[in-house]
Amino acid sequence: MTVRVTEVPFAGEHLRDVAFMLRPRLRNVAMVLGTKADGKVNLAVVLGDDVVARGLNASEIVREAAREIQGGGGGQPFFAMAGGKRPEGLDRAMEAAERLINTKLGR
């Protein structure tokens, strides 16, 4: 399993499009994408089918990590998004999501 965490340089409304474009190619990958634009912060967690099969749930992960950006969110087991009002917390939110993923994977 591979875990990728990155801040992306585009507006939050494009996170969903990118996630759904990449997901079919990433069976063994967990991705955490974050973006800050126009005073807004967004976080997305995308899990490949093999990762979901191991019991991970993107919605649970994004809800927990969103606390760092004073936000909330949700979604489906394979994809979830959160928005928040604290852009300066994005790095901590992405780290929290990565930590949760690795913990659930037994790393």
Model-derived features: positions:
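Glycine-rich, acidic loop segments that terminate in or are immediately followed by a histidine
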Residues: 2-107
